């Protein structure tokens, strides 16, 4: 884990079932949800949402005024996008350029 990244782990019955990693970009007053994951056997129980809500509160307490998360636009990330939108995140279009080497 990078020095500027904070990680919290969700535990159920003594075992890890999910985690969230957050980076603070103090120069922009922005907190970034860098990574969030929940064990497939425990998905759909609100663990991811609880981790995200915890991280948002932590970012706010740390003085951040914006929270950001990046995710894929493919079908495999549809549940993640739905969760972020349900928690108040809004889509921000980004231009990405690629060059074949």
What is each PLM-predicted segment?
Residues 1-34, 39, 52-53, 58, ...:
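Acetyl-CoA-dependent GNAT
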Residues 27, 72, 97:
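Residue-level "edge-of-site" marker
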Residues 34, 70, 95:
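A cross-family glycoside hydrolase active-site/sugar-binding cleft signature
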Residues 36, 41, 72-74:
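Short strand-loop junctions, especially beta-strand C-caps/beta-turns
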Residues 38, 44-57, 61, 82-86:
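Conserved acetyl-CoA-binding loop-helix of GNAT-fold acetyltransferases
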Residues 52, 75-80, 97-101:
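Short glycine/proline-centered loop/turn elements that form peptide/ligand docking sites
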Residues 59-72:
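Conserved GNAT acetyl-CoA-binding A-motif
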